[in-house]
Curated annotation (Swiss-Prot):
Protein name as it appears in the record: 3-phosphoshikimate 1-carboxyvinyltransferase
Higher taxonomy: Bacteria, Bacillati, Bacillota, Bacilli, Bacillales
Oligomeric form and interacting partners: Monomer.
Domain of life: Bacteria
Reactions mediated catalytically: 3-phosphoshikimate + phosphoenolpyruvate = 5-O-(1-carboxyvinyl)-3-phosphoshikimate + phosphate
Pfam families for this protein: EPSP_synthase (PF00275)
Origin species: Staphylococcus carnosus (strain TM300)
Length: 432
């Protein structure tokens, strides 16, 4: 990831469009469709680098994928007939692939090695390794904490696990491993995390018992899996960049269609409402993975906010772009309880404050978030995404607040989740 992108865009932003399919759900659709024996179709998946890494791993296990237009046709021999891979399973920059596949492969008992890029090699894996070992998995990492992860066949047992951190990836790794256990598992969450694994288990006929923050599996749950087609809603994390762009760019009026509105992911909507942003939710569906259209208009009098608790958990991936939004409020804002940002593709507390700070924005880091003061784009300094897709896209949106041209190093990092980001942004800025 070395490309430098020169960006010089003008508002207002106008138009109606969709964003690509949800990354979290695409990963899980690939995994569950591959576990089930037979043929299925995934419609509107995200075909970006992270999800393609997951797909490639299952190809090495014996699953066939055929991509045609906005569909992926899956033909799987089923988990019972997976092949032992004779090469390392490369996860690239995808923490979701690395952590959930660690649980899935441990559950199946396939001898394998999971390795990622340099960024993944710095992200903690003990939060997955430790509970999997408690379940009887034979899994090791460098210093018990880093990739590559070496997995050997073992007999997985159920676990009664109280989550030490609010992490959907850890929860999902345990749930996927528990599919293959002869005994039940019970997982107790300490806070709200995205529940796509649970809703999609239900879609693929895998039984779970959920009571508040307690999730219980049943023995041999994998035997219940059914071949199912799945349509992926638009990714609200990708939509967030355009939501903020319209709110802060004078004259803007956009509508984003078919956006996933899962309540565990829709924190960005509540944040915008708290800041009195001009946002309207229309055409909402009432399904296990609801969708809606979102209309956003420029809002010159955004209110400051104090953001913490479950609202942060429900918008954790959107915090960098929320930080930019807060710079345009008419008072100082505070973001707390966001320690998890330290364990993303970069330490996003540092990279968000550093890179926006270089442009003149007053985004001051704290141990668990930011203190943000009203501020302007002062000058086009040399900035970098540091190979973090969400930092790269946040900086691109920041450029709308300046007449200067902005050069962003390592901008090709956006390809991990949103290859069409810049062309789409350019297309709606040209409609002004």
């Amino acid at each position: 990831m070395t490309k430098t992108e020169t960006i010089n865009l003008r508002g207002p932003l106008k138009g109606e469009f969709e964003v690509p399919g949800d990354k979290s759900m695409t990963h899980r659709a690939i995994m569950l469709s591959s576990l089930a024996q037979g043929q299925s179709v995934i419609t509107k998946p995200l075909l970006a680098e992270d999800c393609l890494r997951t797909m490639k791993i299952f190809e090495l296990l014996g699953v066939n994928f055929d991509i045609k237009d906005d569909k992926v046709f899956v033909d799987s021999p089923g988990y019972q007939n997976f092949k032992t891979p004779h090469q390392s399973l490369y996860t690239g920059n995808s923490g979701t692939t690395t952590r959930i596949m660690a649980g899935l492969l441990s559950g199946i008992g396939i001898q394998s090695v999971l390795s990622g890029d340099e960024s993944i090699g710095k992200r903690p894996m003990n939060r997955v390794i430790d509970p999997l070992k408690e379940m009887g998995a034979s899994i090791t990492g460098i210093e018990n904490n880093y990739t590559p992860l070496v997995i050997n066949p073992s007999d997985i047992q159920g676990i009664d696990y109280k989550m030490p951190v609010a992490s959907a990836q850890v929860k999902s790794a345990i749930l996927f491993a528990s599919l293959f256990s002869k005994t039940a598992s019970t997982i107790t969450e300490i806070g709200i995390t995205r529940n796509h694994t649970e809703t999609m288990f239900e879609h693929y006929n895998i039984p779970l018992k959920i009571n508040g923050n307690v999730i219980q599996t049943i023995p041999d749950a994998i035997t219940s899996i059914k071949v199912k087609d799945f349509t992926v809603p638009g990714d609200i994390s990708s939509a967030a960049f355009f939501i903020v762009a319209a709110l802060i760019t004078p004259g803007s009026d956009i509508t984003i269609h078919n956006v996933g509105m899962n309540s565990t992911r829709s924190g960005i909507i509540d944040i915008v409402k708290e800041m009195k942003g001009n946002i309207e939710i229309i055409n909402q569906t009432n399904t296990s993975e609801p969708t809606a259209s979102i209309r956003i208009q420029y809002t010159p009098d955004l209110q400051p906010a104090e953001l913490s608790g479950e609202l942060i958990t429900r918008a954790i991936d959107e915090i960098p772009i929320v930080a930019l939004l807060c710079t345009q409020a008419n008072g100082s804002s505070v973001i707390k309880d966001a320690e998890e940002l330290k364990f993303k593709e970069t330490n996003r507390i540092e990279t968000t404050s550093d890179e926006l700070g270089l442009l003149g924005f007053e985004v001051h880091p704290t141990d668990d978030g930011f203190i943000i003061h009203p501020s302007k784009f002062e000058h086009a300094a040399s900035v970098s995404s540091y190979t973090d897709h969400r930092i790269g896209m946040t900086l691109a949106i920041a450029s709308l607040l300046s007449d200067e041209t902005l050069a962003i190093r390592n901008f090709d990092s956006v390809n991990t989740s949103f290859p069409e980001f810049l062309p789409l942004l350019k297309s709606i800025s040209q409609k002004g």
